[in-house]
Amino acid sequence: MKISVLASDLSDNATGRADLLARLLSSRYEVDVVGPQFGEGLWAPSRDGPVAYRSVRAGRDPGFARHVPELLALVDGEILVASKPRPTSFGLGLLARARRRRPLVLDIDDWEVGFFYRSGAWGRVGRALNLANPNGLPWTWLAEKLICRADAITVASRFLERRFGGTLLPHVRDTEAWDPARYDRADARARQGVGASKVVMFLGTPRGHKGVDDLIDAVGLLGPGVVLALVGVDPARSGAPRWSGLSHVRMTGEIPFDDVPRYLVAADVVAVPQRETMDTVGQVPAKLFDAMALARPIVSTSVSMIPEILDGCGLVVEPGDVPALAGAIKRLLDNTEEAAALGQRARERCEARYSFRVARATLFPLLERLTARSR
């Protein structure tokens, strides 16, 4: 049986969750990921991986509609899994199901409408009038109103579960493949040119709500001998030129997802300093689970589900509190035994709750029930 995973834009980091869903499903089903590509090329971390992608190059303008028939022709699975309640993924799924009846699962890993609230009242007015963007506020709001049309819903956080219902399916990692014993820490440190310095690492797309500026300031308070490695930074992004000029910051560009362990094992501490905003209220950073799988000591913030996930296996501080963030990082850098114990407990938690095995035990029965009902 084939499953089509529908992604909203294969050129940006929204591809990450679609890629994860495809990897989870591929042990039992034939799977590919289908979606529009609004930018240049497939999102870099997903290139050259095991997931099959089929895309249509499109623009964020009224002309997008003419590409819909091309996209629908690619949606040939017996089951449809739409990643995110956006018009260009879930909306496409609704159209595909209308053409040929088949189960449609909607996976929600962010509160998409919440992203538009960060701009304030006048910003929302401007975005509400932007009818040209197929994933703009008016159409995303409409897609959210149609969530009840899905045959099943999976959600990545408690906030999303309360708001939309459905089955909790957090971000997970392949803890068998991501065994820290398989990766050479000395080689990882040499690759990033950190010498004998202690390494605090942030891995991922460094957007404002992810607290990267807070982290840069916090590590700057720790003095010489500690460097901040930012891995996955597009050098053209806002902020990147300024960060690269700081003596305590090392920057690495976007890397393939399957290379993440080869970089992350270099970290003495992994920091996930989410800010508390409308962007993050429903979000759980996927990179948290990278660090957990690889037994890295973690410092994060009390946003969304993070305190629940890291309870007893990581340090959590208030969001936006730079001195507290610096203090928690320093504590782990100075107390290596505590750091190692927390890292090991984080891996054990990941294996028990946030592994491919656990996610498949949730996802596969859900799909089996749907296909049984549709026969």
Q: What do the PLM-derived regions correspond to, one by one?
A:
Residues 210, 256-263, 268-292, 300-308:
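Nucleotide-sugar-dependent
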